Amino acid sequence: MPAQPSPSGRTVHLSTSGVDARIAPDEFGGFVLEIGGAVQSHVDLADPARIRYEYLRRMAHVLDGVAPAGAPVRVLHLGAGALTLPRYLQATRPGSEQTVVDLDRELVSFVLAELPLPAGTDLVSVVADARLAAVDLALDGERFDAVVLDIGTGEEGAEHLRG
């Protein structure tokens, strides 16, 4: 198995959220995305179908039931993180069309520079408020097999997403 690339060690400031993001190797052979000092996502570049966090595994299991095994799907991801589920879908359902929406302009480009997606991943990135983008996409006639909502909703989240 080839060695996984090592992130540059740099951080990026997320201008909308006002916090820093960084990617670091972890003790499990993957990488974690930290935003504002809190771990948000885990990625295993050597095995994108391996999902470390239980809540993401549960989401992946739901996505597994959307269509027959291996069949491509159209998925809207509200919240980008380290793009763990888009990577999973490319590994398990090659040819899937995916759209990711995130409020922080810098996040997706940073994640892609540090942890490139698997070859052939069809991913469109939209910088917008997830709620507004979902409405706009629906009004534009876009249809998806599944919508994944993975946005922080605690005190650090956007005001309209809190509790």
Give short role names for the model-derived ranges.
Residues 1-69, 91:
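Rossmann-like AdoMet
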Residues 27, 46-163:
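The AdoMet/dcAdoMet-binding core of the Class I SAM-like
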